Amino acid sequence: MVKRAILAVVIASVLAAPTFADMKVQIYDGFGTTNGGEFRAKVLEDPIGIYNKGDFISTFCLETKEYLSIGGIYYVTLSDNAIQGGVGPAGDPLDDQSKKIYNYWLDTLTHNASNADDVQNALWYQEGEGGSSNYLNSITASAANVKVMNLWTGAPYQGYAQDLLVRVPLPGAVLLGVLGMGVAGLRLRRRTER
């Protein structure tokens, strides 16, 4: 009975997941005086990461040779890579230190132009896109729950635009797996106690 319940929950979670084609953002200018971020991306449709429709995502670009337009509307896919930047067709994997810098911006730094410039330059440096090294390239912070928002001018995977950062929740499949193992462990424990 428990196996069927767990299987039903797993199947329902897969079927209920939003399709990437419905993820869209509109880009607004934020703090910072570089040719990069901070940008503010307004979620227009389905949730993106921890953000719901109407929320603004404070974010930074990863590539110096990809572009976006303030006021532009873009389709979004989530990945662990900057698509057009770096080696091979799979793109450039997001560096863990870049994740730490982004989380430090979201959780610790005061959001102003000076700090935004430091974050953008540190991210570009970390990703091999130029920029300049500063104290942020050696901070210790969490690298968890950060993904790349790949922006597209047309439907997903059509018309490369910029790659930005976004915080995401713990993946649902991992959470369900942990819950499933917990239930299985409790059942096994009950059997061995008898």
Regions found by a protein language model. Name each.
Residues 2-3, 22:
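The identity of the second residue at the extreme N-terminus of proteins
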Residues 22-167:
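Short, surface-exposed polybasic-aromatic patches that bind anionic ligands, especially phosphate groups
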